[in-house]
Each structure stands twice: as C-alpha cells, then as structure tokens.
Amino acid sequence: MAQHQVNYASAAGLPIALTSVDKLVNWGRSNSLWPLTYGLACCAIEMMASGASRYDFDRMGTIFRASPRQADVMILAGTLSKKHSEFARRLYDQMTEPKWVISMGSCANTGGMFNTYATVQGVDRIIPVDIYLPGCAPRPETLQYALMMLQKKIRRESANMNNNTKQNLRLV
C-alpha cells in the first residue's frame, strides 16, 4: 500500500489548522475583554465614567470585573506609589493567562508631575504594559480607542504567545 506524505503547512510554515484555530481563539478573546477595575487617582473617575450609561462599554463586550481571577485586562489608572506597587503586582499575578495591561494617564505612564521617592516612575517598571494611554486625565473616548487598539493587537498575535514576546503600543 502506497503511503503519501501530505503537507498541511501554509506558506509561512505553520500548520493551516492551527492558524485557523488561532484566528478563532483570538477573535473570541478580543471581543470579550474583561478589565480589572483598578483606579488609583483622577484617571479612575474617567474609567468609571466609561462604564456608565453614556459610554456603556458593556455593549462592546467589555465588562468591568472586581476580581483579578475573572479579569484578563488590567487598567492601571493614576499614580502608583512604591508601597502600592507590591499590591498591583500581586493582582497582576493572580490574573489568568493571557492577560494584558493598559497604563492609563501620564501619572501611570511616567509618574506624571510626582517626581518623588515614593512614586513609581512608570508602571512598566513593575508590570509589563501592552498599551500606554497618554493624557491627564484621558477621556472615556480615549480609553475606548485604547481598548479597540488592544482588540486589534490580540487578533494579530498567536494564541500561544507569552508576555515576553509581546510588543508595546503607544497611543499618541
């Protein structure tokens, strides 16, 4: 009996079945983002406004969660102190994989106007950040745009990608 070797690889060298499954999995992940509500300062007010009836992020599949075990996106909004950074890191570690982080506001991105010994000068020193959202304080429309950019990023990445191979996005 003759045996034929069939090549199931695409032009990129990846198996066709796996790339199709990756696209399906990433589509599901991108359309059901569940951010962890973690507001630290002024930006938290804008984050809360984004969940209210005027902007209603729930209609896009973005449902805010209070437990890190139910969340896959962490939005760090506001100034992060060094004392509080241990708690933020613990929450990040408790989140399920895959997980993404949005740094919201100038204080979270670079420490803002608080250049002191007690302030972390950028959340990315504690937690790997996927999207940097500039502004003081960014409007809910900007947060909505950041979530849309995160959805595009999730659709592009491989389903087995870990946090070390991710690339950061800066929204300007």
Swiss-Prot record:
For this UniProt record, give its keywords in alphabetical order, as a comma-separated list: 4Fe-4S, Cell inner membrane, Cell membrane, Iron, Iron-sulfur, Membrane, Metal-binding, NAD, Quinone, Translocase, Transport, Ubiquinone
InterPro entries from the UniProt entry: NADH_UbQ_OxRdtase-like_20kDa, NADH_UQ_OxRdtase_20Kd_su
The superkingdom of the source organism is Bacteria
Report membrane topology: Peripheral membrane protein
Q: Which Pfam families would you find in this protein's record?
A: Oxidored_q6 (PF01058)
Q: How is the cofactor bound?
A: Binds 1 [4Fe-4S] cluster.
Q: What reaction does this enzyme carry out catalytically?
A: a quinone + NADH + 5 H(+)(in) = a quinol + NAD(+) + 4 H(+)(out)
Mostly located where? Answer: membrane
Where does this polypeptide localize? Cell inner membrane
Q: Needs which cofactor?
A: [4Fe-4S] cluster
Q: Quick one: a GO cellular component term?
A: respiratory chain complex I
An example GO BP is: electron transport coupled proton transport
What are the protein's GO molecular function terms?
Answer: 4 iron, 4 sulfur cluster binding; iron ion binding; NADH dehydrogenase (ubiquinone) activity; NADH:ubiquinone reductase (non-electrogenic) activity; quinone binding
Enzyme Commission number: 7.1.1.-
Which residues take part in binding [4Fe-4S] cluster?
A: C42, C43, C107, C136
Family membership noted in the UniProt record: Belongs to the complex I 20 kDa subunit family.
Q: Give the NCBIfam families listed for this entry.
A: nuoB_fam, PRK06411.1
HAMAP family recorded for this chain? Answer: NDH1_NuoB (MF_01356)
Subunit structure comment from the entry: NDH-1 is composed of 14 different subunits. Subunits NuoB, C, D, E, F, and G constitute the peripheral sector of the complex.
Q: What does this protein do?
A: NDH-1 shuttles electrons from NADH, via FMN and iron-sulfur (Fe-S) centers, to quinones in the respiratory chain. The immediate electron acceptor for the enzyme in this species is believed to be ubiquinone. Couples the redox reaction to proton translocation (for every two electrons transferred, four hydrogen ions are translocated across the cytoplasmic membrane), and thus conserves the redox energy in a proton gradient.
Query: What is the name attached to this protein's record?
Result: NADH-quinone oxidoreductase subunit B
Its organism's taxonomic lineage begins at: Bacteria, Pseudomonadati, Campylobacterota, Epsilonproteobacteria, Campylobacterales
